[in-house]
Amino acid sequence: VGKSSLVNKLGGGKKAKVEDRPGVTLTKQWVTTNIGIELLDMPGVLWPKFDDRTTGENLAFTGAIRDAILDTEELAAKLCGKLYTIAQADFCTRYKLDPSSLEGLSDYDLLCAVAKKRGFLLSGGELNTERAAGIVLDEFREAKIGRITLELPPKKESTKPSEGDNA
């Protein structure tokens, strides 16, 4: 749920513009609720550069970074690789792929396997990986592949006392 959706829910109507993509809210907008509370809807802020490449990739996978400024084939290929690693069963089930036939394939080859299985071909029999990329990204964002977590919280250190401790 985005900020504008929350403002609309609390404000009791559709006062702030909402779309299923980032960057819709361009200016500040005050919304008054039915009980007189004023809420301020504002554009989001995204760091121009991330300390960790994985953070940027994960944001792009989810659509938090506009596809228009990205190479979607490269992005979808990386997503295929990540899904094959962290959610192999969901990935293979969605695209009807045999996991044993995918062992050792590059990220791009995994995207090609999706294109081939879905029958995405250009004239001359060349795989339409651009179309496959769009499908993989859309289906991941719509949770059609499954409800998959890209990041896990850091492991909590054990608070169990060790054998020599007096508790």
Language-model region placement:
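Helix-rich effector regions associated with P-loop NTPase G domains
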Residues: 14-167
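Glycine-rich phosphate-binding P-loop
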Residues: 1-12, 42
